[in-house]
């Protein structure tokens, strides 16, 4: 059920004590782990003094030293997506080598939350920001049970529920708009993370997300489109993982869809698609996972910048994530390489019951 909480310790253990075993058992490598650490170092070095990250890389000590800045204005979206890789590797505001970095980022998000009658508005004008930032708060709360995070996380979840399209069940840039699958996916991720952390999530909100997925599916639920059933590989990967978040029972359709997406191998430029597809294939223990993962893992490691001020970062020729620039691409690449142990909370076995 949407409101059922898993034992946080069992859900997040892979990020800390179980990390090495998870890397060995699920398809990571010493090279992917080293790549994660380089990526986290680059992210830490590009945090602004106020605790935020910016897609345009302003406010940090970069001084224009990195190419390919992003254009999205929401600082809560950029701060949220930069925090997620630290949390994914077990770093919180109370534990880990990057705890000061994480503490400043979480404090920035909490300070940016704007109280409204509908809940805590954290989006800075876009539901992308709301979903990503709420996911970071919910994950940090689940990992630490820090009461200081409970209030902001609860308020942000309440805003997400209120912002859902009451007719078709999705989310888009502004509250109440007919949904698209990319914005919807971030809200669903935040909702599932909060639910497994024990925070209240209305079951009707999760049900509504399932209704949205019904509207954008095609080919018997194996493919998914952006706002309608016209599918692309990227939107299909997102939709299939969202089906797993919402507890869809047609696992045969999910597995067929994943097989179709995995068959050509990972597109070396499609980091957004591969970020979602890696999670779905591993979560399903899909037969295509070992071969697909080996290629995806090694090509991401090989694509990481190794020299100069950009060392540790990534930039892909991916039109689906171009507005996020180097910051978003680096965060997504690190998150994808953390998939072997980043089981909390939405990716764990309890998350898709």
Language-model-detected regions and their locations in the chain:
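An alpha-helical repeat/solenoid feature that recognizes helix-turn-helix modules
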Residues: 2-41, 45, 55-101, 114-158, ...
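Acidic carboxylate motifs that coordinate Ca2+ or other divalent cations, activating on Asp/Glu
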Residues: 50
């Amino acid at each position: 059920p949407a409101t059922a909480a898993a034992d946080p310790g069992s859900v997040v253990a892979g990020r800390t004590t179980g990390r090495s075993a998870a890397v060995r058992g699920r398809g990571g490598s010493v090279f992917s782990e080293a790549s994660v650490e380089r990526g986290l170092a680059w992210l830490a070095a590009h945090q602004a003094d106020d605790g935020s990250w910016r897609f345009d890389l302003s406010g940090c000590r970069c001084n224009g030293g990195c190419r390919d800045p992003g254009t999205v204005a929401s600082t809560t979206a950029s701060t949220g997506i930069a925090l997620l890789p630290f949390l994914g590797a077990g770093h919180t505001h109370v534990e880990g080598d990057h705890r000061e970095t994480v503490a400043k980022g979480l404090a920035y998000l909490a300070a940016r939350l704007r109280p409204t009658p509908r809940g805590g508005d954290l989006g800075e004008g876009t539901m992308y920001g709301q979903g990503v930032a709420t996911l970071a708060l919910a994950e940090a709360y689940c990992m630490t049970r820090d009461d200081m995070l409970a209030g902001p996380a609860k308020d942000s979840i309440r805003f997400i529920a209120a912002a859902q399209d009451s007719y078709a069940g999705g989310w888009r840039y502004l509250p109440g708009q007919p949904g698209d699958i990319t914005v919807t996916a971030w809200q669903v991720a935040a909702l599932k993370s909060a639910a497994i952390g024990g925070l209240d999530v209305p079951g009707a909100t999760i049900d509504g997300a399932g209704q949205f997925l019904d509207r954008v599916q095609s080919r018997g639920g194996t493919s998914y489109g952006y706002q309608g059933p016209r599918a692309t590989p990227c939107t299909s990967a997102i939709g299939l993982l969202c089906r797993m978040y919402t507890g869809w029972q047609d696992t045969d359709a999910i597995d067929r869809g994943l097989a179709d997406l995995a068959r050509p191998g990972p597109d070396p430029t499609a980091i957004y698609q591969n970020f979602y597809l890696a999670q779905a294939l591993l979560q399903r223990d899909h037969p295509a996972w070992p071969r697909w993962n080996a290629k995806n893992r090694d090509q991401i490691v090989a694509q990481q910048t190794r020299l100069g001020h950009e060392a540790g970062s990534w930039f892909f020729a991916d039109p689906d994530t171009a507005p996020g620039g180097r910051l978003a691409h680096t965060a997504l690449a690190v998150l994808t390489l953390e998939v072997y142990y980043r089981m909390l909370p939405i990716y764990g076995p309890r998350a898709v019951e």
